[in-house]
Amino acid sequence: MLDRRFLLRGSCQGALAVMGLPFLDCLLDSKGKALAASGRPLPTRFSTYFYGLGLTKQLWVPKTAGKDYEVTEQLKPLQPLRAKINVFSGLRVAVDNNPNYQHWSGVGASATGISPTKMSQFDSKTIDQQVADVVSRGARFKSVAASCAGDARQSYSSLGGANTLPAEVSPLSLYTRLFGPGFQDPSKGDWKPDPQVMLQQSVLSVVADDRKRAMQELGASDRSRMDQYFTSVREAELQMQAELQRPEIEAKVAIPAAPEEMACNNALPNLRKVTPLMSRLAALAMATDQTRVFHMSVSEPGSQIFIPGDSLGYHQSTHEEPIDPLLGYQPRVANYNVYNMELFLSYLQELDAIPEGDGTLLDHCLVYAFTDVAFAKIHALDGIPMLTAGSANGRMKTGYHINGDGSPVSRVGLTAQKAMDISLESWGSGSMETKSPFTELLV
């Protein structure tokens, strides 16, 4: 009898081909929403997605709220998946007594609910890591990050402070991490845990056992550092525990051959090639339960995306292009804004292309998309755009425009975590602390 870990195997031109089975009727309950054997619901995945330099207010903010909002120029690229996307306008980032760190305050506030106190550092774990602490047990990787522009530093996934989790920098590096050494075919009859992983787990256990003695000999500052270290050790042990179990491949997917090396940088033509491929690998990673939390970035804050031949590029255009007196906005910048939405759509389409249970992978995800500024020319933070996609396994309504009416951006983060079934009553700190999710979206 088949079980949900069964894989089809074969060879193609001498290479191993692996295809996971979909959630067949015999594996699901009568509604196609849960595993028949255990009654457990399909896993809900979480993803953050970062793009730099925001959008143009006159071109993206709908005039009407609710489900029947009008299509705006800069939301038009998202129309194919409009019914699965929520748009949030009228949100603000309060810096309180901190400076407005250019191109950083919006990033930190959106990702943590806290106004940053230092440039390029987060004042707590980012939202994806807070979610991963709860949902990732049993997945091979607690979380994975990827940079479409090929810079490992372009990751806005962090354990707090300067502890940013480095991003995979190319489709090949992401593929190798996910489906290279350590990825085993669970349908093999002789499947067994990797001895190297077993040895590493044993060594870590010995180190952890010596924790108490070491901590007694340290001062307060060093004890804090050791706490961070042992937290990392524990997370490594949990990952290894997952690797010592058969991986779960639960969607109708074929693991492709490794991609070729390709240029990964800020040139828009390259991003248009790389982003869909990285997105496809991200979708496969979540569909095969390699990870349940994924962070994707297409640029840094203050995006340096450029079109070959454009002497200014995106970032410089936001500061040097004059506002057209007739249009009331910067037309070149507005075009770059649209390109960002097109790249975001390519990410969502890859998630939506994988059938799973009674819907698609996107239906069983929640994607949290954020940026660094509202109006890039002056680094304004009021009106910073926020987007979510996917219904988190039916826990969030979609297809809405929500006008935040000046409320803190942290309300979106709290709403997202509530939809992910994270137990918390408030999120953020200072002026951005909130106990008010957008309850009209929660199911």
Residue ranges, per PLM feature:
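Ligand-binding pockets and gating/stacking loops
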Residues: 1-443
